[in-house]
């Protein structure tokens, strides 16, 4: 009988939770894991993620006589391109569309005249107007660098020229570009 009491006592002790004997509670927490798996064919060259195209000073006289400024060249370059996932890439330019000039982006200004009097247009190296929201011709990916070359210019509206209301003073505009891999 003594043996059965000892066995019962040992069994009861073994069945008790280890937390019963702990002096303090064990504190824990949760973990969350997240991320994004991407399939980019290239890396944007440092400095080309956010471009600043500076027209410097544009003469209102030139806009009245020529209707547009001299073009400013710029490029968006990609490096570390691989054909493992994609074979080509296009680029799409976009921005707040000008209200009266198709394929021009609108400007904001703090000058003395209406900022709607001018807009900014993009061209390729052959001076062909680039349509906003339309992908460029595809460029083949290689193991080197891919470069998209553009030009931008400021153009005055015909009504601003006729009414002598071209914006004078500082102006700015925002545009975006999107890379589309195929």
UniProtKB/Swiss-Prot annotation:
Location within or outside the cell: Fimbrium
Matching InterPro entries: Adhesion_dom_fimbrial, Adhesion_dom_fimbrial_sf, Adhesion_dom_sf, Bact_Fimbrial_Adh_Pro
Transmembrane segments annotated in the record for this chain: none
One Pfam entry name: Fimbrial
Gene3D superfamilies: Fimbrial-type adhesion domain (2.60.40.1090)
GO CC terms of this entry: pilus
Main location: other
Highest taxon in the source lineage: Bacteria
Record bears the keyword NADP: no
A GO BP entry: cell adhesion involved in single-species biofilm formation
Cysteines engaged in disulfide bonds, as pairs: none
Coiled coil residues, start to end: none
Residues annotated as signal peptide: 1-22
Keywords for this protein: Fimbrium, Signal
Family (UniProt): Belongs to the fimbrial protein family.
Full protein name: Putative minor fimbrial subunit PmfF
Record organism: Proteus mirabilis (strain HI4320)
Lineage, highest ranks first: Bacteria, Pseudomonadati, Pseudomonadota, Gammaproteobacteria, Enterobacterales
Primary gene name: pmfF
């Amino acid at each position: 009988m003594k043996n059965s009491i000892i066995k019962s006592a040992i069994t009861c002790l073994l069945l008790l939770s280890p937390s019963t004997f702990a002096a303090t509670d064990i504190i824990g927490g949760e973990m969350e894991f997240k991320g994004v798996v991407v399939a980019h064919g290239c890396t944007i060259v440092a400095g080309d993620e956010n471009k600043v195209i500076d027209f410097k000073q544009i003469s209102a006289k030139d806009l009245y006589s020529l209707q547009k400024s001299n073009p400013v060249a710029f490029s968006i370059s990609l490096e570390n391109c691989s054909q493992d996932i994609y074979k080509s890439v296009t680029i799409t330019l976009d921005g707040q569309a000008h209200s009266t000039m198709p394929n021009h982006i609108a400007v904001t200004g703090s000058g003395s005249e209406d900022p709607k009097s001018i807009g900014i247009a993009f061209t390729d190296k052959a001076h062909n107007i680039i349509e906003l929201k339309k992908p460029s011709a595809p460029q083949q990916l290689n193991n080197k660098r891919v470069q998209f070359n553009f030009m931008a210019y400021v153009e005055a509206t015909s009504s601003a020229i006729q009414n002598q209301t071209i914006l004078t003073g500082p102006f700015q505009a925002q545009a975006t570009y999107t890379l589309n891999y195929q």
